[in-house]
């Protein structure tokens, strides 16, 4: 209010007494704002403007340089918005003259109508706080409360009120991980949070992050998720919300498909109980009717191995979501999870260990070395080093070592992930030809977890038999 009065006193605009802020319809103010935006855009090569706070309440002062009156103050609003449309056009023209693009984000006090998309690029959700936390369940993690709150606002907008605007044009403030937000997430929670946010399909992500809260792992997670989101936006841009209201403890998700049969399905259970469900790949799920023989890949699917089945239109997928579980699954002829990376060779080494030897060699060549030292499993893969979390002597263990296309090296112990490391300096190609006396030793040029080794061997065996025929 003080700033608005100062603007008015200086002759640069007017003060709206009802909303106690600047009168954004005042012609003098609009002329000054337009000049400021155009000049600043040119001087500082600005490509993004976030215009926050239009008209909270109409200005009824007839002495200001705008119309007043009409039903629901329609004359004021009509003239105000016409003036701002001219401003949007002027700023865009300034960028266009230099052959450059401009993103305009309209935030507070805007009708979320697709009509605006001829002038702006995104519109704030309107029915939401910057950040919020749902109260659908007691004693749930803070992360779950935040995700449920945001998706509850999406449900209210897109389902209850049935807004007719594609989700890619909605701005939602995420991701938020800053000191003022009073949140704290583990690295695992941070990854889950970012992936599910990306699947809402919004084209604009403002990174509301406090660098003091970030560590190396979180920066790498952020980079990985943002690059995956960008390289798959031709799919995610078609996201739609399906399922029930998460604030009423219903399973829900976001479904995205493009015309080529590439798809992304993100599912979430917002409750503290397991939830079985069946997905049918049909038009209701956004699938193109010509969907045929696509593969399924895990983007975010904790503890689950890769799936070797193929899927076509009308197929059903039976799943069970654990309490608060998120699954992000990708479909397509091609594995597009790592399109943004200079992918490296992938492989899987698996074997059983049932010896009491505290020190022995499992396998070794110039690039890969697996040993048991002081009872613990030691893995050297190119420049990556990984050690098991505990001793493997004194019983039988199923061991799997995986290098993925994204340069992650993972150790699975008895069907569960035991440890992982990111090899930033990984070579593109490494030698996996080696021999070993270990039980059921196998090395294949494909990344998969232990429980899928048998299935993979079966697939490879069938392929060899077909070639022989």
Q: What feature does the model see in each segment?
A:
Residues 421-452:
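Flexible glycan-contacting loops in extracellular carbohydrate-active proteins
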Residues 84-303, 316-331:
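Active-site-proximal substrate-binding groove within the catalytic cores of carbohydrate-active enzymes
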Residues 338-385, 392, 408, 443-464:
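Extracellular glycan-recognition modules
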Residues 397-410:
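Localized edge beta-strand/strand-to-loop motifs within extracellular or lumenal beta-rich domains
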Residues 308-339, 465:
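C-terminal beta-strand-rich structural cap/linker in extracellular carbohydrate-active enzymes
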